[in-house]
């Protein structure tokens, strides 16, 4: 909406250094009450609503992460850069076909460990069992547009293999946003047709907004990954219970 109201042209956009508190969320080594991320949104042309454009944007973001990891390794040799040179793109539907007996979380782990860095495409579209790889709102990313080989979605997550935690780590969620056609389709799929009467939705449906792409990059998660930390509380100040602190201390981890 802001891109429309401030007349942003294709190729231009906005970003925010977002800080938020989520006191009702569960906390663990990669989730805290305090949330910090770079949220960004860019106006694009209608002809940019393609899988190739999405991949190009993902590659640019990943390249910035890779360069940062390399430079840190040059300055501090103990911070080994083990990110692969290129990110691997995988459709959530292809991932299900490759690992049909695993749940989505385990599929992510298996693929992230195999490739080092992956972008899972089409998160939100129902897989063969009728359930999506992960939940997505119907009025945000376009996860339903068919792209190739019968697969769907113009969105996804950047996920890396974290050697310190021996686990996968999501660093960014992003995608090409819904246009009018995708919005109507996804609201119907989710049984949320009544949202068409909301202010934002009405404006999109009547063509007030430019086509856009956007996402969020987790600041603390990226920092803990680049600095080889095992807990998000090692790179940001947040609120932790004494039980959480004691558990971390027992593993040689001291929370800020």
Report each predicted region and the residues it spans:
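Class II aminoacyl-tRNA synthetase-like tRNA-binding/catalytic domains
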Residues: 1-31, 39-43
């Amino acid at each position: 909406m802001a891109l429309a109201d401030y007349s942003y042209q294709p190729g231009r956009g906005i970003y925010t250094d977002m800080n938020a508190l989520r006191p009702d969320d569960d906390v663990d080594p990669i989730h805290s009450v305090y949330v910090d991320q770079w949220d960004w949104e860019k106006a694009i042309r209608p002809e940019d609503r393609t899988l190739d454009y999405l991949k190009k944007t993902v590659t640019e973001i990943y390249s910035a992460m890779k360069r940062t990891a390399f430079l840190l390794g040059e300055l501090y040799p103990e911070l080994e850069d083990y990110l692969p040179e290129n990110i691997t793109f995988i459709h959530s539907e292809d991932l299900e076909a490759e690992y049909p007996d695993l749940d989505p979380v385990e599929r992510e782990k298996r693929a992230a460990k195999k490739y080092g860095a992956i972008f899972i495409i089409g998160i939100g579209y129902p897989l063969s069992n009728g359930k999506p790889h992960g939940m997505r709102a119907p009025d945000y990313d376009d996860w339903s547009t068919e792209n190739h080989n019968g697969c769907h979605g113009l969105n996804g997550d950047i996920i890396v293999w974290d050697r310190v935690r021996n686990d996968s780590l999501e660093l960014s969620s992003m995608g090409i946003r819904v246009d009018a056609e995708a919005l109507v389709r996804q609201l119907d799929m989710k049984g949320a047709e009544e949202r068409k009467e909301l202010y934002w939705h009405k404006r999109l449906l009547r063509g007030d907004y430019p086509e856009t792409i956007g996402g969020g990059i987790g600041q603390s998660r990226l920092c803990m990954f680049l600095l080889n930390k095992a807990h998000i509380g090692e790179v940001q100040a947040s609120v932790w219970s004494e039980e959480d602190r004691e558990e971390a201390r027992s593993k040689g981890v001291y929370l800020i």
